[in-house]
Regions:
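Beta-rich, blade/repeat-based domains predominating
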Residues: 33-48, 75-94, 98-99, 117-135, ...
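A detector of repeated loop/turn-to-beta-strand junctions in beta-rich toroidal repeat architectures
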Residues: 57, 97, 151, 155-159, ...
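C-terminal closing repeat unit and adjoining cap/tail of repeat-based domains
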Residues: 18, 251-308
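Beta-propeller domains
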Residues: 20, 45-74
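Blade-edge beta-strand/turn elements of extracellular beta-propeller
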Residues: 18-30, 67-75, 106-120, 160-180, ...
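Short loop/turn segments immediately following beta-strands, especially the blade-tip
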Residues: 212-220, 300-306
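Blade/loop signatures of beta-propeller domains
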Residues: 1-27, 306-308
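A short loop-to-beta-strand structural motif that recurs across blades of beta-propeller domains
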Residues: 59-61, 99-101, 160-162, 209-211, ...
Length: 308
């Protein structure tokens, strides 16, 4: 049961720890509206702007405090999840071409990977870069099942979680016991990897949980994979981790804040389903929220882990 606190309207606290993470005088802001389905928010501190994808409209958009929303890329190849590598380059998951691309500083694009074991990937969904430079991404079937998010295509292999070494091109399948791997993020010390399990496409009862894996000392293998937290209503989608190790996860009724021990601390209620989010702005403490057709933001009293 939610507790009564001095939190702003539109937030619910289930644990006293949540109150220190939220500002009493900062409410949810609507930044822009009128899109179709937003995904892949990533903050560019060097340009003080947010990039995000309007997936069905096949375009990448740019938002800044001074200029609002503009088109960054007119044809995004149905880009989904995004992040930056340690050189500041944009890494994007693409549905249409079923690959992972890197945007270079000179404006060109490099395809990092499009196959596993000689077969096409499904539809890379979300991505995170580890401190050693390795790129981890989820590859479910969601982007293959309709024309709305890239075009129907046949799957050539099971849904899986991958690790890519961009220096050598070595690709390793880290886990394949998923119905639908989705958002993913490392704990601040990178000893844990959290992965959303959203279930098989079209399932009548989608999976609603986040799994937690132990990362080996060399960062090249996983163990465990037990259920860390169950999301309700809706299902776990994109999420980020803050400096305290809390997960801020997109859900059916907004953003759920989950402690490292798996406890639901509180919720930021959002009028529309949240697909993805990221921390950004000057101190990396503003939460940018992609919610269906709308972009929201909320100033918080915590900071995202300082990683792309």
């Amino acid at each position: 049961m939610a507790t009564q606190t001095l939190l702003p309207p539109g937030t619910e606290s289930y644990d006293p720890r949540f109150e220190s993470l939220i500002l009493f005088n900062a409410e949810l802001e609507l930044l822009a509206d009128g899109f179709r389905w937003l995904e892949g928010p990533v903050w560019f501190g060097d340009h003080q702007c947010l990039l995000f994808n309007d997936l069905p409209n096949n375009r990448t958009l740019r938002w800044s405090e001074c200029h609002g929303v503009s088109v960054f890329r007119e044809s995004s190849d149905y880009g989904n999840g995004q992040t930056r590598d340690h050189q500041g380059r944009l890494i994007t998951c693409h549905h249409r071409s079923r690959c992972l691309n890197r945007g270079e500083h000179d404006g060109t694009t490099t395809t990092l990977v499009g196959q596993a074991d000689g077969k096409a990937l499904n539809a890379p969904n979300d991505v995170v870069v580890k401190s050693d430079g390795s790129i981890w991404f989820s590859d479910p079937l969601y982007g293959l099942i309709n024309d709305y998010e890239g075009g129907r295509q046949l799957s050539e292999q099971p849904a899986a979680l991958y690790r890519l070494d961009p220096a050598t091109g070595e690709l390793n399948r880290m886990a394949s016991d998923f119905d639908g791997p989705n958002g993913l993020a490392f704990s601040p010390d990178e000893r844990k990897l959290y992965v959303a399990e959203s279930g098989a496409p079209g399932a009548l009862e989608p999976r609603q949980y986040i799994r937690m894996f132990d990362v080996s000392e060399d960062g090249r293998s996983l163990s465990g994979g037990e259920i860390f937290h169950k999301i309700t209503p809706g299902w776990a989608d994109g999420f980020r981790v803050d400096e305290h190790g809390n997960l801020w996860c997109g859900a059916g009724d907004g953003v759920h804040c989950i402690a490292p021990d798996g406890t639901l601390l509180g919720k930021v209620l959002v009028p529309k389903r949240v697909s993805n989010l990221c921390f950004g702005d000057r101190f990396h403490s503003r939460l940018f929220i992609c919610a269906s057709t709308t972009l929201y933001a909320l100033f918080t009293n915590t900071r995202g882990v300082q990683r792309p």
